[in-house]
Amino acid sequence: MTNVIEEKNENYPIKIKECLSDYKPIYYRGNLSLLDKPSIAIVGSRKASSYGKSCARALAKCAVEYGAVVVSGLALGIDSEAHSACLENGGETIAVLANGVDVFYPKRNQAMQKRIEETGLLLSEYEDGTRAQRYTFPVRNRIISAISDAIVIVEAGSRSGSLITAECAQEQGKEVYSIPGNITSPGSLGTNKLIRDGAVPLINFDELFEDLGLSKTNKKINQIFLSKTESRVLEVVKSGSELSIEQIRHIIDIDLAEINAIITILEMKGLIFCEMGKVSIANL
């Protein structure tokens, strides 16, 4: 069920009120109290490289170790990796949506969105039924930065939408961190430019959380448990450089619906990547 907090409500998120002059009603599903906890935004390109995905996952896991909430936008690429790694390590995450919280977008993240609703927080300025439009993404980025104590741009090309998040954060007086990338890679032009222009180069994740005054908690990071069939599928994927779902199904000898479900589960657990029908092992 979707809840709404009007602008004049005394429970309206203080972080948003302090950062934005044009704040609007907030629609949400999940645990609104997560907004009161220390948090970092982890954002970046939809077309992320294996390096970017690995960095996003490692940073999200580190956030869990320090008891910080992970904030992102539920988009493909860096956002998905951050949410997924946080969930798999038993952390708490907030997804700020460019559509209504009842709308599944992107469709590939439907299972993840449901899980965030159950264990974290879905947040949006848009009422139920609103579909994502080109203009709603940059608008929601100012919410991502507003509710976060620090913003990390993991990987971004020269025209990545995550650069808008960085700009919003700077306008709000938030610290922006950027992970350095290969200077010859188009996918790192944006992050490297941010560093050139004054963003903090993030080369040690612990330093970020120490900057926020956080200490590592005693929380044990969740172990990843697999069913017998999940383990079999993972071993098959490990044995080949890049396999189609049909090839895996043929080797394991199970029906298509079951293999698709297992592929989704393993991808949610951050163990594999599935793109364009091809499955490969994750770079952790």
Where are these regions (language model features)?
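Glycine-biased, small-residue-rich flexible motifs in mid-sequence functional cores and linkers
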Residues: 2-284
